[in-house]
């Protein structure tokens, strides 16, 4: 299977790339700082690009069987990488006719019960609301899509 990993140079992304390669998948690692990754595996392709660049993201996704998003960012809510990055990924996946995505989200978007998310609970930690809301927005882009997630 040919995979692309967004957020490939983060703590989680590095492990996702390693595991995917170990399992025999061809992997495209996408990010601003992909030079940090060791390019010793012939099944690994490093793609330097910006998450918000529509053309770069489209070109990277094209020809893949699935997308993995482990995008990170700051916790203050000012960094919109999670939400706007997911919006661009979803848009470019549709254009490239790639339907399968696995995306990492934060604890706030886990269900408290059938109709309520943890982030909507009164006792949800206030310091995590900004990043939690970023995860929620990213999740909403996935929910609104016709992708297989």
Predicted regions and their residues:
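SDR active-site strand-loop-helix element
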Residues: 6, 30, 70-71, 101-106
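N-terminal Rossmann NAD(P)H-binding glycine-rich loop of SDR-like oxidoreductase domains
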Residues: 3-25
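Conserved beta-loop-beta element that borders a ligand/cofactor-binding pocket
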Residues: 140-149
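Conserved Rossmann-fold cofactor-binding substructure of NAD(P)-dependent oxidoreductases
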Residues: 42-65
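Short loop/helix-cap segments at secondary-structure boundaries that form the rim of catalytic
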Residues: 35-43
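N-terminal Rossmann-fold cofactor-binding loop
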Residues: 30-35, 50-51
């Amino acid at each position: 299977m040919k995979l692309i990993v967004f957020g490939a140079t983060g703590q989680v992304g590095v492990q996702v790339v390693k595991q995917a390669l170990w399992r025999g998948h061809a992997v495209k690692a996408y990010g601003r700082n992909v030079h940090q990754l060791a390019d010793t595996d012939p099944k690994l392709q490093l793609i330097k690009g910006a998450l918000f660049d529509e053309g770069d993201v489209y070109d990277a996704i094209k020809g893949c069987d699935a997308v993995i998003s482990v995008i990170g960012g700051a916790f203050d809510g000012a960094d919109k990488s999670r939400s706007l990055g997911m919006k661009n990924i979803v848009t470019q996946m549709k254009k490239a006719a790639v339907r399968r995505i696995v995306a990492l989200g934060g604890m706030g978007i886990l269900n408290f019960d059938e109709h309520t998310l943890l982030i909507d609970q009164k006792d949800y930690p206030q310091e995590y609301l900004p990043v939690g809301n970023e995860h929620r927005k990213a999740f909403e882009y996935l929910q609104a899509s016709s992708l297989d997630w």
